[in-house]
Amino acid sequence: MENIILFFEKENGESPVFEFLCELPVKHRAKAYWEIELLKNHGKKLKEPCVKKVSGDKYEDLWELRIKFASDISRIIYFIPIENTFIFLHGFEKKQIRFRQKSLKSP
């Protein structure tokens, strides 16, 4: 059975992961699509370092597609509602998230 990759869409039609991918530099975007293709071809058989279960009890059903290009690290968060379907929820650059968390802390 073929694996299916779906991009979550908000009610207004926006797709956070698609928008994230479009904002990446061309070479980084190509690497991201290559990793997505790996997931599509290998499904649940794909293991670390390409994919990893998100840690924490409240994130029990979430996985991350791990994308590394040179010193840039990105993640796409997804879940698997049925055996061969992967729904992409959110994409981010890892360094960017660290910066945001730091900037939210009060001095």
Regions found by a protein language model. Name each.
Residues 1-73, 82-85, 93-107:
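Basic, Lys/Arg-enriched alpha-helical interface segments
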Residues 89:
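Conserved catalytic cores of phosphodiester-cleaving nucleases, focusing on short active-site segments
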